[in-house]
């Protein structure tokens, strides 16, 4: 009977595993493996959360700061604002009127700053699209001629497109008259 080399080597390996290096048969482990005694894990007793005060939050008092900022600058300073009518003989109407911020500190200044920082505007997207695919004008369709794109060139782009290889102007269909560029 023919036994393949792979099966024969597998049987030989199994026979050798049953015999220790000394040539004696292996004993079954009646004892545990030798190891250090590790104490069991200690159960942690966590403290219950304490009652928070009304103006305190787990994040370290940010709620109190938020309340002070929402009340206005006089709450943050804990002093009444000194204005033109906030002197020693201030009227009741001036004290009852809410304090208004100047126009430079209003919503317009905030929106202008955020508008300058915005990078996803329509103009930025258009410029990025032209940078990514500069050969867009060579696609079919669009203008009066054969291969013009949907966008007509304006301004400096139109002037740049009109220049030939040696600074000579191209004719209307975009071919150089006999220069072979």
From Swiss-Prot:
Where, subcellularly, is it found? Answer: Secreted
Q: Which domain of life is it from?
A: Eukaryota
Q: Which SMART domains match?
A: NAT_PEP (SM00183)
GO terms assigned for molecular function? hormone activity; peptidase inhibitor activity; toxin activity
Give the compositionally biased regions (Low complexity). Answer: 104-114
Q: Which GO terms describe its cellular component?
A: extracellular region
In its keyword annotation, does this UniProt entry include Signal? yes
Tissues in which the protein is found: Venom gland.
The answer, when asked if Secreted is one of the entry's keywords, is yes
Disordered, as annotated region: 74-150
- Identify the stretch annotated as signal peptide in this record: 1-23
Alphabetical UniProt keywords: Cleavage on pair of basic residues, Disulfide bond, Hypotensive agent, Metalloenzyme inhibitor, Metalloprotease inhibitor, Protease inhibitor, Pyrrolidone carboxylic acid, Secreted, Signal, Toxin, Vasoactive, Vasodilator
Any GO BP? vasodilation
Q: Which Pfam families does the entry mention?
A: ANP
Q: Which residues carry this modification: Pyrrolidone carboxylic acid?
A: 28, 31, 44, 53
PROSITE patterns linked to this entry: NATRIURETIC_PEPTIDE
Q: Which cysteines are joined by disulfide bonds?
A: 165-181
Query: What are the transmembrane regions?
Result: none
Chief localization: secreted
Question: Which family is this protein grouped under?
Answer: In the N-terminal section; belongs to the bradykinin-potentiating peptide family.
Protein name, UniProt field: Bradykinin potentiating and C-type natriuretic peptides
């Amino acid at each position: 009977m023919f036994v393949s080399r792979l099966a024969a080597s597998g049987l030989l390996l199994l026979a050798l595993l049953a015999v220790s290096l000394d040539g004696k048969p292996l004993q079954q482990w009646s004892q545990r493996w030798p190891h250090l005694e590790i104490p069991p894990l200690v159960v942690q007793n966590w403290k219950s959360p304490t009652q928070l005060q009304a103006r305190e939050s787990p994040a370290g008092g940010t709620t109190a700061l938020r309340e002070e900022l929402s009340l206005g600058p006089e709450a943050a300073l804990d002093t009444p604002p000194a204005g033109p009518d906030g002197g020693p003989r201030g009227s009741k109407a001036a004290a009852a009127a809410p304090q208004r911020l100047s126009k430079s500190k209003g919503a317009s200044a905030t929106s202008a700053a955020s508008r300058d920082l915005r990078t996803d505007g329509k103009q930025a997207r258009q410029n990025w699209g032209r940078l990514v695919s500069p050969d867009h004008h060579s696609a079919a369709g669009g203008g009066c001629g054969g291969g013009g794109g949907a966008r007509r060139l304006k301004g400096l782009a139109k002037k740049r497109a009109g220049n030939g290889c040696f600074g000579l102007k191209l004719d209307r269909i975009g071919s150089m008259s006999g220069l072979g560029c």
